[in-house]
A protein has these predicted regions:
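Conserved PLP-enzyme active-site core in the AAT-like
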Residues: 3-13, 17-24, 28, 32, ...
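Active-site-flanking structural segment that lines cofactor/substrate pockets
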Residues: 57, 63-93
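Structural motif
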Residues: 91-94, 117-120, 175-176, 209-212, ...
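Short helix-loop-beta junction
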Residues: 85-89, 141-148, 354
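Conserved C-terminal alpha-helix-loop-beta "cap" of PLP-dependent enzymes
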Residues: 313-427
């Protein structure tokens, strides 16, 4: 028995039928050229991260445990230099005290907006959890409660920026403009770094002093550039997504202009204290090592997303991005057209997990969302979406959002298992 036969036998032991396995093999063979390009991008970004670490003179002392106030936490301070080097920014704030991506965004917005200022989204409605942060849906402590005005410019029908409407929307009170790089729970295309750069340049011509913030979640290390390379004043993300490499157990980051990062630090801790406090509590090695591995991990996730797109496109489902499009984040949307399809897909992803594979996910009323949501994530870190995961709101158009996979082999297994569940239920 050769290795290919042994692999197929192991797939059968995990519940993958020969029909599903053979279908997947044909799709994978057609993607060799795409996968080679992804490996080259990973090599480029790996070298970029190593260079950033060398420039910051990372050493073993950076991994030491720090507690209490965290004064002179060498590892924490050096890591923030590394992030500033990676993103080519003046400064960065990278902390375990930033609990998630939504927290990082809420922190950045509340730190840099004052009563009477206007926050303008030029990419339409933001991600669901930000609706309560902003006050689109009433919530205690929202920006609206503190007198921040919110306005948005919807995207054009093709998913591109509506430059005419953006020009009209920018006014005297417009203080901060936000761009969400990834699609979130939408079926629009995600933005490329170049598209974001074009929008920022357009905005800065109209009002040079306006702050341009990019929600960078799911986009780090997908391209050779980051939004901070094309004019973003602030880029914001989560360490349990791409830059944590699957190892960071918690955390978020903000990178950008020094004066704006200072505002974020004062909001995170206290006026007068800022970046000086906030002990790292023993997580530094996982933060450094996760960042080091991130380009390779992101490459595996990208291969999984492209594989998923091609598998489901071949079966006649609408997928965003499609099987041939260039990638700008790690998320793959598949419109399955029914609640049963979304649930079966997510149950397949869960069944492929190394952790909690025996659990059957069901839709539930998740805080921050306006409909029931189903989430599949048999992850080592709870909620980690750089690990193999899938989720989606149980509402029209019944799209599921697949992302992650610390390795390509695991991402492949997840997609095959999702297809197996749909096959068993007679949906495909």
């Amino acid at each position: 028995m050769d290795i290919s036969q042994k692999i197929q036998k192991l797939y059968e032991q995990t519940g993958i039928s020969p029909e599903v396995h053979d279908f997947g093999e044909k799709i994978e063979k057609s993607l060799k050229e795409r996968f080679d390009k992804i490996d080259k991008m990973a090599e480029l970004n790996q070298l970029k991260v190593i260079h950033a670490m060398q420039e910051a003179r990372v050493n073993a002392e950076c991994f030491n445990y720090a507690s209490g106030y965290g004064y002179n936490d060498f590892g924490r301070d050096t890591l923030e230099k590394v992030y500033a080097n990676v993103f080519h920014t003046e400064d960065a704030l990278v902390r375990p005290q930033i609990t998630c991506g939504t927290h990082a965004l809420a922190l950045t917005l509340s730190a840099n907006l004052r009563p009477g200022d206007e926050l303008l989204s030029i990419a339409g409605k933001p991600y669901d959890t930000l609706e309560e942060v902003i006050g689109i849906r009433p919530s205690t402590g929202s920006l609206a409660e503190y007198g921040v005005i919110y306005n948005q410019v919807d995207l054009l029908p093709d998913g591109s920026f509506d430059f005419d409407s953006i020009k009209k929307a920018i006014g005297e009170k417009t203080k901060l403009i936000t761009i969400q790089r990834s699609k979130g729970y939408q079926t629009r295309p995600s933005f490329s770094v170049d598209q974001i750069g074009e929008a920022i340049a357009f905005v800065k011509k109209i009002k040079p002093e306006v702050i341009c913030m990019v929600d960078n979640c799911y986009g780090e290390f997908v391209e050779e550039k980051e939004p901070s390379d094309v004019g973003a004043d602030l880029v914001v993300g989560s360490l349990i997504k791409n830059p944590g490499g699957g190892l960071a157990p918690i955390g978020g980051y903000v990178a950008g202009r020094k004066d704006l990062i200072e505002q974020c630090a004062y909001r995170l801790t206290s006026p007068g204290l800022g970046k000086e406090v906030g002990a790292s509590l023993g997580v530094m090695q996982s933060f450094y090592q996760g960042l080091f591995l991130a380009p390779t991990v992101v490459a595996g996730a990208l291969k999984g997303a492209i594989f998923a797109a091609n598998v489901y496109e071949k079966l006649g489902y609408a997928v965003v991005p499609d099987g041939k499009e260039e990638r700008h984040d790690i998320i793959q949307a598949v419109t399955l057209g029914s609640a049963e399809g979304v649930i079966a897909f997510c149950q397949g992803i869960q069944a492929a997990a190394p952790v909690d594979s025996y659990v059957t996910p069901e839709p539930w009323a998740m805080p921050g969302y306006d409909s029931d949501v189903i989430m599949a994530a048999g992850a080592f870190v709870q909620g980690s979406s750089i690990e193999l995961s899938a989720d989606g709101p149980i509402k029209e158009p019944y799209a599921v959002y697949f992302q992650g996979g610390l390795t390509w082999a695991h991402a492949k297994l997840g997609i095959l298992m999702s297809l197996q569940k749909l096959y068993e239920k007679g949906i495909v």
